[in-house]
Amino acid sequence: MSVKEIVSNRKAFHNYEVLETFDAGIVLTGTEIKSLRDHGGNLGDAYVTISKGEAWLLQSSIAPYRFGNINNHEERRKRKLLLHKYELQKLDSRVSQKGLTIIPLSFFFSKGFVKVRIGCCRGKKSHDKRQALIEREKNRELAAAMKRSYR
């Protein structure tokens, strides 16, 4: 199974603690697929909502296809996510808990189809973000010291 990541939401890993991930199909038009092949997507402000038993991706941006004509797609439109019923029920029960939300983490190609990796996330507090930065800096310094010692 070949998986090629197109766009990732790096801000999500900084602002949220990812508890569980799901892979979902997405309903796209032809020009949206062509634009994603050119890496023309952005998941910065995007989120997922569940209404009437269907999952929808909102505020995601897929740039208009540069060779498209007048029938090009809207950049920020509502896009339907394709999930199994039990996955939708699981996500819906998780989101009903206080403080949890569903955030798209990445677009990727799997067997020629565009998929979205979504995560059930809890927001980080500012002190948690600082703690993560301090931890990352310590690991960098440790790796640099190890590298110097092997020379």
From Swiss-Prot:
Its main location: cytoplasm. It holds the Pfam family SmpB. One of its GO terms (biological process) is trans-translation. It is found in: Cytoplasm. Keywords: Cytoplasm, RNA-binding. It comes from the Bacteria. InterPro entries: SmpB, SsrA-bd_prot, SsrA-bd_prot_CS. GO terms for cellular component: cytosol. One of its GO terms (molecular function) is RNA binding. Coiled coil: none annotated. Belongs to the SmpB family. HAMAP family: SmpB (MF_00023). Required for rescue of stalled ribosomes mediated by trans-translation. Binds to transfer-messenger RNA (tmRNA), required for stable association of tmRNA with ribosomes. tmRNA and SmpB together mimic tRNA shape, replacing the anticodon stem-loop with SmpB. tmRNA is encoded by the ssrA gene; the 2 termini fold to resemble tRNA(Ala) and it encodes a 'tag peptide', a short internal open reading frame. During trans-translation Ala-aminoacylated tmRNA acts like a tRNA, entering the A-site of stalled ribosomes, displacing the stalled mRNA. This is SsrA-binding protein. It comes from Chlamydia muridarum (strain MoPn / Nigg).
